[in-house]
Amino acid sequence: FPSSGLHSNGFSLVRKVFDFDKGGIDKTYDELGSTIGEALLTPTEIYVKPVLALAKEVKIKAVSHITGGGFYENIPRSLPEGITAVIEKKALKILPVFDIIEKTGNIPERDMFNTFNMGVGMSITVAPEDADRAVRILRESGTDAYIIGETASGEDGVKIC
C-alpha cells in the first residue's frame, strides 16, 4: 500500500536536515506543491479496513507496517526464517518528500530505506499466484496497491535491487 508521507517516522533525522529552529520547514518545493513543513504534517494512512477486506478473499502470508526502521528492519520481522524479500526499486512509487530529504540532507540511499517508508506504508505478502488478484481486489475496493517484489529462499532480510 502506498504511504501518505512520513507516517511520523524519521523526524529526528528530518529535524537535522531542515533545521526547524531556523525556519527550514517553511521552504516551498514545487514538487510538493507546499512547504516541507506542510508535507511533513500529512496524516498517517490507516490500512485496517483494506487489510481485513483482503483477508476475506486471499490468504495473507505476512503483513509488514513500514514504520521506523524502514524496509530493512520491518519486512524481515514478518517473514519466516530463511526467506528474503527481494524488492524492485523501480516498482516503488517513492514520494517527492523522500527525494527532497535525501538530496537536502545528502543521505545515502540505504539509510533512507532503513529510516523511512519511502512511499510504501504497508507490505502484504501473498502466494505468487494470488498477487495480481490481491492487487485487483484492493484497487476495486478503492485502495491503491501494487506489486513491489517477491520473496525467495536465502538469508533473512531484504534485498533492494
Question: What are these language model-derived features?
Answer:
Residues D21-I25, D30-L41, E45-C161:
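Glycine-/charge-enriched secondary-structure boundary and capping motifs
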Residues F1-Y29:
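Phosphate/diphosphate-binding glycine-rich loops and adjacent basic-rich segments that engage nucleotide
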